[in-house]
């Protein structure tokens, strides 16, 4: 890293940026996988925790809080239960990270060629929002598979990644791989815009602090992520509820997931049956996960990119990697 002197769009050539972004996604995903499984389980849980009478007809587990859910999954499904969906998730994060960072760099550089340059926060917001939309759309089927695997209990619906792709294609068609995609894009565009704008704004002042192991990047990533995640969380929950729709809906760990159709109608249904709190189920673990995930992602990205630049790894593009 340049000690805050360079912005993300000014660092490294295209191949170095893709490699660093993919590596950052891989490392980040493995570290936070258990929290991601917990978040998905809590988001898919529809019954009231404060009303014991609503639990009478429930056949699956009842999760209460992050630690309790971690213990329950570990007890009932073993240590591997905390990494369910990790294979499609690793593929997702590798592809997503590479596409996201390379798109961010390309869009930022393009915006800087405008006759009237945009203010840095505006440029960062637009670049982050568009890059997030591109990366989300490109990798969405992997995101859906990750959710479905994480939602499985001991009675598996899909035996492997290959089987899941085959079964969804056969029973749901191409549309099945994009259930909830509208909510995902509606969520990720403002999220990544807020995240990158916040990260760029915080990166320079935090980089001037004497922090161990060069953790200024991590600190900026944590703060930016918490702010952005809280703002768009209801759409993340809606996306998860829509991703498990279809013929397998009643076979997941939560067998009482209602039928949902469309983002707007899903939000209305959740508000009607669970109130505003229903849109924020899993927020606590989501924020707990978002902080280390973003910290690890940005720290890994900056340091891997710095290592690649020092090693002159990758092809220099456009006269030394200065352009796109």
From Swiss-Prot:
Intervals holding Solcar repeats: 12-110, 119-205, 212-307
Keywords, ordered alphabetically: Membrane, Mitochondrion, Mitochondrion inner membrane, Repeat, Transmembrane, Transmembrane helix, Transport
InterPro entries attached to this UniProt entry: Mit_carrier, Mitochondrial_sb/sol_carrier, Mt_carrier_dom_sf
Chief location: mitochondrion
Residues that span the membrane, as ranges: 15-35, 79-99, 125-145, 182-202, 218-238, 282-299
Cellular localization per UniProt: Mitochondrion inner membrane
Stored SUPFAM superfamilies: Mitochondrial carrier
Pfam families: Mito_carr
Residues making up the signal peptide according to the UniProt record: none
Gene Ontology process terms (BP): transmembrane transport
Keyword Mitochondrion: yes
GO cellular component, one term: mitochondrial inner membrane
Membrane topology value: Multi-pass membrane protein
Main function: Mitochondrial transporter that mediates uptake of thiamine pyrophosphate (ThPP) into mitochondria.
Alphabetized PANTHER family for the sequence: SOLUTE CARRIER FAMILY 25
Protein family (similarity comment): Belongs to the mitochondrial carrier (TC 2.A.29) family.
Name of the protein this chain belongs to: Mitochondrial thiamine pyrophosphate carrier 1
Lineage: Eukaryota, Fungi, Dikarya, Ascomycota, Pezizomycotina
Name of the gene: TPC1
